From Swiss-Prot:
Protein function: CNTF is a survival factor for various neuronal cell types. Seems to prevent the degeneration of motor axons after axotomy.
UniProt entry tagged with the keyword Cytoplasm: yes
Tissues in which the UniProt entry reports expression: Nervous system.
Keywords linked to the UniProt accession: Cytoplasm, Developmental protein, Differentiation, Growth factor, Neurogenesis
Domain of life: Eukaryota
Protein localization: Cytoplasm
GO molecular function, one term: protein-containing complex binding
Record InterPro entries: 4_helix_cytokine-like_core, Ciliary_neurotrophic_fac_CNTF
Keyword DNA-binding tagged: no
Protein name: Ciliary neurotrophic factor
GO cellular component, one term: glial cell projection
GO BP field: astrocyte activation; cell surface receptor signaling pathway via JAK-STAT; ciliary neurotrophic factor-mediated signaling pathway; muscle organ morphogenesis; negative regulation of neuron apoptotic process; negative regulation of photoreceptor cell differentiation; neuron development; positive regulation of axon regeneration
């Protein structure tokens, strides 16, 4: 019996998926609250439409049902690593702009950054259990983002938070699918099972 197929590995896999679902749900709830604070503090209209922004991963995926569990985990990991970088940039821009005078938005962004970092670690644990180590981050330091106007920074931040909320929903779906199967399952997980 392979190590990934042992009862203890299966139990750990299920536990990690369940905890991941709870983390993603909490993140979704918190990012929704953060969006409200962000829109208010930045003086934006909540209904404003923001086009796709370079570097912000989108949660939409074609052929979601055909993805394997490992593909789902790798997609999630890449997205949350990008969000970790984007949130750190947003936090730094916020601190440059307002310093420590903003007692609500800065701490909320910092808390979200911690949640995203914890979720990255959680996804890496799941990939380890899947008998596939987490890929190394592509570079230690991403290229510096182009200098944006204040308004462009606000719109990029809005897009980042909206997409993060969508990713949290997708992560719950992905982890639910993954939890239905044991560790190391490489088959497509979204397809209906014959009974």
């Amino acid at each position: 019996m392979a190590a990934a197929d042992t009862p203890s590995a299966t139990l750990r896999h299920h536990d990690l998926c369940s905890r991941g679902i709870r983390l993603a749900r909490k993140m979704r709830s918190d990012v929704t609250d953060l969006l409200d604070i962000y829109v208010e503090r930045q003086g934006l209209d909540a209904s404003i439409s923001v086009a796709a922004v370079d570097g912000v991963p989108t949660a939409a995926v074609e052929r979601w049902a055909e993805q394997t569990g490992t593909q789902r985990l790798l997609d999630n990991l890449a997205a949350y690593r990008a969000f970790r970088t984007l949130l750190a940039q947003m936090l730094e821009e916020q601190r440059e702009l307002l310093g420590d005078t903003d007692a609500e938005l800065g701490p909320a962004l910092a808390a979200m950054l911690l949640q995203v970092s914890a979720f990255v670690y959680h996804l890496e644990e799941l990939l380890e259990l899947e008998s596939r180590g987490a890929p190394a981050e592509e570079g230690s330091e991403p290229p510096a983002p182009p200098r944006l106007s204040l308004f462009e920074q606000k719109l990029r931040g809005l897009r980042v938070l909206r997409e993060l909320a969508q990713w949290a929903v997708r992560s719950v779906r992905d982890l639910r699918q993954l939890s239905k199967h044991g560790p190391g399952s490489g088959a497509a997980l979204g397809l209906p099972e014959s009974q």
